[in-house]
Amino acid sequence: IRIGSFQRLFYHDDTDGIDMLARHVARHYYADTNGGAVVNADAETADLLVDLLQAIAGRIAITAGNWMAAGFVHGVLNTDNFNVTGESFDYGPWRFLPKFDPGLTAAYFDQTGRYAYGRQPDAAMWAVCRLADCFVKLVPKSTLEDCLHGFYATLESALAKAVQRRLGIAFDNADEERDAMLARQLFTAAKASDHGFDQIFHDLFGGKARSAGYDDDMWVPLLDILSGAHLVRPNALQHPHFNETEAVSLTIDEVEALWAPIAAADDWQPLVEKITAIRTMRAALDGAAI
C-alpha cells in the first residue's frame, strides 16, 4: 500500500475510501506484536488520520536517514515509491556512493538531480506532505502541518544512530547535539576527501583511524568526537573482516563487473564471492563469530 494509494482515493473525492483504507492500514500494519494498538484503528476519523500520518512520517524519516548513512541512492522517489510501512522498496536504477557526493543521481532521466543522494530527505518529506494532502477534507490543515514538524529531527536522529552503528561505536552518555555533529563532521570530511564512502566507515570502525590517510586537518573535528566513543562490542575488531584492507562495497561499476561474466559465459562465481563477502561483513557488524 503506497502513498499513491491514498492519492488515488483523494483524486476521486472518496473520503469514505480514505477512511476505510486508513483503518485497514492501522489494523494490519500498525498494531504491535503484543496486540496493543500503535495506531487505534477504531478511533474517530480525524484522530485516526492524525496518528497514522505521524506514524507513517516517522517510519519514512527513519528509512531516509538510514539511506543517507548507507550512502544509498534510491533513484526514483515519487509517491508510489513510498509505502505506508516506511520500508525501503520499489528500487529503480539504484546506486551506492563511490565517494561522498550529494549530487549523485541514479536514474539516467534525472537530468535536474531531483532524486539526487543529497535531496532524498526533502524528497521523503515531499512525499509525506502529499499524504497529508489526502486528509485535508477530514482533518484541519493546521493539525496536519503540526504532525510533520518533527520529520527532519526524526530523520537526523536516525542518521546519527546509523552512522554510529556503521562505525561500531557508542557513547557513555546521551547527547543529541554531539551525535548530530558526529554525522555532520563525517559527511563534511568525506566530501573533501578522496576516500571511498564505504572505505571511510571501514577505516574508522571502532572510532579510530585504522589505516593511513586520516591525518589531514579536515578529519580532526570528527576524530575528536570519536575519541570519546567506545566499541559496542570490545572484540569486534578481531573479526577477520577487519583484517581486509579494502572495504566491501557495491558501486555501479562493481555491479556491472559482476554481471559481465554472467552475460558472457553464465559465470556466477564472482557474484557468489561478492555475496559471501557481504555476508561476512554483516556477520562482523552483527558481532557473529566466523
Identify what each model region corresponds to.
Residues I1-H74, T85-N173:
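ATP-dependent phospho-/nucleotidyl transfer catalytic cores
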Residues T79-D80, V84:
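Catalytic-loop Lys-Pro-X-Asn motif of eukaryotic-like protein kinases
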